[in-house]
Amino acid sequence: MAGQKIRIRLKSYDHEVIDQSAKKIVETVTNAGATVVGPVPLPTEKNVYCVIRSPHKYKDSREHFEMRTHKRLIDIVDPTPKAVDSLMHIDLPADVNIEIKL
C-alpha cells in the first residue's frame, strides 16, 4: 500500500470517549507498524436550540439547550496490510461515529 493515506474522522458528543477512542486507534495502528499523524482536534460544532417553556402562552419564557459535537482527525501514512487488518477489527464504543477514507 505504498503511497496511500488513510484518513479517519471521529465524531462524538462526549469528549472523553472520543479521546479514548483516538488513543486506542493510534496505539493499535502504531503497534502494527504504520506511522500515524494525529489525533488532530477539529473545531467543536455547537448547536443551540431555543424552546418555549410553556405549551400555550408566556412566549418570553424560553429555555436554551445546546448540543456539542467533538471531532478528531487521524491520518495513517503508508499503512501496512497488518495495520489495515487491525484497524478493521478494533472495538470502539457505539457513541463514536467513524468515517474512514482511503
Curated annotation (Swiss-Prot):
One Gene Ontology biological process: translation
GO molecular function terms listed in the Swiss-Prot or TrEMBL record: structural constituent of ribosome; tRNA binding
Gene3D superfamilies named in the record: Ribosomal protein S10 domain
PANTHER family per record: 30S RIBOSOMAL PROTEIN S10 FAMILY MEMBER (PTHR11700)
Role of this protein: Involved in the binding of tRNA to the ribosomes.
GO cellular component, one term: ribonucleoprotein complex
Family membership: Belongs to the universal ribosomal protein uS10 family.
Name of this chain's protein: Small ribosomal subunit protein uS10
InterPro entries xrefs: Ribosomal_uS10 (IPR001848), Ribosomal_uS10_CS (IPR018268), Ribosomal_uS10_dom (IPR027486), Ribosomal_uS10_dom_sf (IPR036838)
Subunit composition and interactions: Part of the 30S ribosomal subunit.
Keywords annotated in UniProt: Ribonucleoprotein, Ribosomal protein
Source organism, top-level taxon: Bacteria
